[in-house]
Curated annotation (Swiss-Prot):
Organism: Rattus norvegicus
Pathway info: Cofactor biosynthesis; ubiquinone biosynthesis
Biased composition (Acidic residues): 80-91
Gene, per the UniProt record: Coq9
Modification N6-acetyllysine, positions: 169
Name of the featured protein: Ubiquinone biosynthesis protein COQ9, mitochondrial
Major place of residence: mitochondrion
Amino acid sequence: MAATAAVSGVLRRLGWRLLQLRCLPVARCQSPLMPRAFHTAVGFRSSEEQRQQPPHSSQQHSETQGPEFSRPPPRYTDQSGEEEEDYESEEQIQHRILTAALEFVPDHGWTAEAIAEGAQSLGLSSAAASMFGSDGSELILHFVTQCNARLNHVLEEEQKLVQLGQAEKRKTDQFLRDAVETRLRMLIPYIEHWPRALSILLLPQNIPPSLSLLTSMVDDMWHYAGDQSTDFNWYTRRAVLAGIYNTTELVMMQDSSPDFEDTWRFLDNRINDAMNMGHTAKQVKSTGEALVQGLMGAAVTLKNLTGLNQRR
């Protein structure tokens, strides 16, 4: 109970911190006074990302692991200008190991064992797992980073089709609803172990990077939805969407309905509620309360879910 109370206290403060996103560097806003949450504070994104072409409907989005973000190792050139053996930086090796390790998460969870198996699948020694911490946080953050990159790619490709007149622009509420579902479906191959992943992300040392990834994700969703706001609505819209994502994620972990139908029904209701809110002081108040309550609920729910089989 003491641990839950401590985490809850941290989350309560972070709920309001998310409403003050000025502390995060931003890049895509129309106004120089309106920041945009910086992308992927953690993880190892490559310069040549190989991604699958996603279906236009989020309902058809693949539930399997996404394409790897890989790149060939650079060539080392000595002082004479002759190329020597291929050389990979430590960061590149870590990136490849973590990506390979995701294949073994369904069997081993977010553990050093999964990382060791990933290293061995690349022909490396299992001792390479010692490059990472023992709590699995680096593997989890790597996965979240990849999922966010995949979502960004999906939304970017759809925007291009709309601009070319090859697809119809959806209403904001439907666009956001489909974007959240698309992102949550990426968790399905790992849903058995996702409660444990969230409990690790809620550890004090992991909250800053995980919060950064969350704000980056909802910022992408609103950007591609066409949000042009430069006032306080910029913050409230992202805070509300973050709360919707978090609470729907918790429902998903406990959902035993076919294809998570109950989860998507819950998501529909939350999106409708958010779209029906007026731009008033009441909205601002409910925004903060919804986010804090969602994060507080995460702490309590994860306490009950961690280590349990939710799909048996």
